[in-house]
From Swiss-Prot:
Pfam families: FAD_binding_4. This is FAD-dependent monooxygenase macF. SUPFAM superfamilies: FAD-binding/transporter-associated domain-like. The macrophorins cluster contains a single gene insertion (encoding for the terpene cyclase macJ) compared with the yanuthone cluster that produces the linear compound yanuthone.
Amino acid sequence: MTKMTSIIGILMGVLTTATAASIPTGSSAAAAAALGSLGVSPPSGNVLIGNAGYTCSLLNRVLSKNETFTVTSPYYDVLIDEAWSENCRLNASCIVTPESAEEVSRLLQILSILETRFAIRSGGHNTNPGFSSIGSDGVLIALEKLDSISLSADRGTVTVGPGNKWESVYKYLQPYNLTALGGREAVVGVGGYILGETGGLSTFYNTHGLAIDSVTRFQVVLPNGTIVDATPTEHADLYKGLKGGLNNFGIVTEYDLTTNTGVDIYYEIKTYTTANTPAVLAAYATYLLDADINSNVEIQINPSYTLVFYGYLGHVSAPTDFDPFSDIPVASTMYPPTNGSLTELLLSIGSTGLTSEGVSYSGTFSFKVTGSTFLQDTYSTYLEAAASLPTGAVLSYVPQGVIPNLVTQGKSQNGGNLLGLDATPQVWANIFVQFPATLSQSEVAGSVDSLLANLISSAKSEDLFLPYIFVNDAGAKQKPLQSFGEKNIKYIDTVAKRYDPKRIMQRLQNQAYFVLEEL
């Protein structure tokens, strides 16, 4: 899941213990026979089950040398360090970098036969340790070589591999004057952004809806090795399940995305002082209650200042949608009012990325926007929490405003999604902290958890709380699948049973939001 992957964020420069213990170790003649059916000859002696070291030695023999990396490989540390957050740089027993869906198929079958734990990584921007990383007891499947991009003959869809970063997709589409719904930070990976994070917010998400709703085809490798296409008409149940069900079904190796014409946009970026931030939030609430679907305002609050991005689709001058903010004194202008290309904007500020040094931790909750002062009131609660953190820990608050059009877009495209969203003006609030690894992770994380609990309690007391948990920003302890509603989570479980009857993705995959744990 991508944390703070917004325009303004860029500028800022589980398996339970019991489940893990259930994975067997020992030897198995049946496993040897199953490997033989794949044309894989295990070393002489017993076949070890649930032993990552043994599995890695076998993979090193079966796959080409440039696809399997152990701790002694020169490229191993480089691959580990691609994880964005320092606390996610876990030392896997080995790292495998498949180059095709067929290789992913072979790999998944071997891991399933040998009952070996694994994690899947696209761009590595997840801040929850173990969600796209794994320690010495498992194999890391790094999808970076699945980086193909191709445009359909009618230019209506672009086929993208999960190993791409959005920067590559934007650059590929730019000569055609096209774009796709993708990360607001260009260095975020495609796979985690779309699938592992249930949706993905693009720069104009309120106009077009979530990125997951723009997917017209998923190529999926099921745990038994079968490669299938999931579309509205082919494996339609799996297609619908993937639009909310995360990585509970298999490994997605291709996405077909609807393209959009690369129209000009109006944008400007300003900063405001802490004294004026309550006024900014009051204006934001007013804006969200009557927002033009072609406009977008993004806010990132930091302890010493607040950043605001103003955007509008089309070549315009000073859109009136931003009038609620016009009388608030501006501390500085980072980008003056500009008419230009969305792609150029994303590439120009996204190439810098966010710092990857230090540890990251986050959480999220949702609430309705009404005529109340709740949004402004959250600011004082946030400031108190930020001031209580130890030196070096920087707490950010990102209230991501969502208008009803995002919800209706999701329901109208290709059969809808499984997120269970309410069509009401709302905020998906992200609380995000970065801090040096020398600080106590439990202390800092505990402060964030306490802040979230206080904000949720306040929202409930004012009857503004919404159950939806935006997976992109969710913490490891949160249960987003439950927030989709009972009907939707049961549907996800039904589809998971159908396509993964042995529950490989939930028994062997390292930490994630598993449907079995949230039912």
